[in-house]
Amino acid sequence: MSLAGIRVLELAAVGSGEGRPSTASGIAVAWVAKLFGDLGADVIRVESADGDDRVRSRPHELHRWLTTNKRSIRHRLDEPIDALLGDADLVVHDGSWPELAPELVTAAWPGLVALAVTPFGQTGPYHDYAAEELSVIHGSSWGFLSPSAATDIALPPLKAAGHHATINVATAAAAAAAAAVDHATRTGQGEHIDFSMYAAAAKLTEFAPAAASFLGVDASRLGTKTVVPWGIFECADGLVSIICPEQEQWESLVELMGNPEWASLDAVATQPARRENADLVGIYLGEWLATQSVDELAVQAQHARVCITPVTTMAQLDANDHLNARGFFATAPDGTRQLGPGYKLDQPWWALGSAAPALGEHDGETWHPRADLPGHGLDGERPSARKTGQASRPLEGVRVCDFTWIWAGPFATQYLAHLGAEVIKIESPERPCLFRRFPFHPPGLEDHIDGSGSFQIYNTDKLSLGVNVRDPRGREIIE
């Protein structure tokens, strides 16, 4: 939806509280506000008057990406921000502002949504610990699992360069904030969101929690992966990533390779056998892949329904035909070529309307009138809070048909369910979700399709409807 008319206050400056602000939380706050600004919200970025900024100080001019579609005003700690808070719909901060304690916000601005993005949350024994991207990665166990299938126990775990964990978890924070803001605009009831980057990152560790809670096994980056083949291989002109979690995908890959003699060996006939002989599979598969062209193989694999994709370099990404055809790259008003959204909308709500502002470029300004904002803005002010007997979750009344499976889709729809939506998972009785079939059952529990931990961790809070979509009667039910 368009967010035109929504007012977002981004507190980039560090407050006067005793918290331990970090670069990670500063970038997370900036990313949340950017996501709102890119969809039309009126975003005011409150920055430190002395120029001490955790985004502006980052290399490679990161701020020119994270501060687009925002206005910048300078702030001194002895100056109140009540006027801006009073007319804001959402304030995003790093937990260092005492005036944004939950009880104070509720009393002074009952319709305001306040999102505190901190490394460990605002309660608990770790709440005042200093932390950065490295801490979030390794504290959540994400780093401990990387790189997967490592062979040398003496080598340390790794993290990807940059701020991948921060951007990922901050996107989840923005989704929660968007739902809360929508709820507040309808009911007048604000919300305090205590968002823990640490907890959100732990949610993304996929099978590790299921292995611990369902199997009593500590997941590790060492040893053989559960699925073989699964990894990055060299081709004649670049790299590809390949994974074959299902037997039929392996059989399609064998056919794609021309049914080589080695593929008929009992040692590679089944998934357990391939896992037992992973080195052998890697040698044979690597020899064949070394003769293939990345682009040609990727197309052939798509037709064969085999999961093979190019491993793209930065230069290749910039020149990628698919991304350019979809208009992924966008040009800001200052001429910089920037990354666009990962989605396409029917309506032109996403836009790079303004370049990154200079520090204090908009000093003295306040909120734009809601009616003057482009798009479908809100008319009038925030509604008065309505008293109800029981607090409602923001997406109650929303119904979602979930046709996804495996991981990414179920994770997204589960998030909607946690926020109150009624999510109905449409499933095939003939071919259940792969995660239902994974062997993640607690000791002593029969191998049942409803008992796999890999399915449970991403599908709680949902309803399930088994439908044969190939049958006209099944399609009629769905329609």
Residue ranges with predicted function:
Residues 1-186, 362-479:
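N-terminal helix-loop segment corresponding to the beta1-alpha1 unit
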Residues 220-225, 230-231, 333-336, 356-359, ...:
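Short Gly/Pro-enriched turn/cap motifs at secondary-structure boundaries
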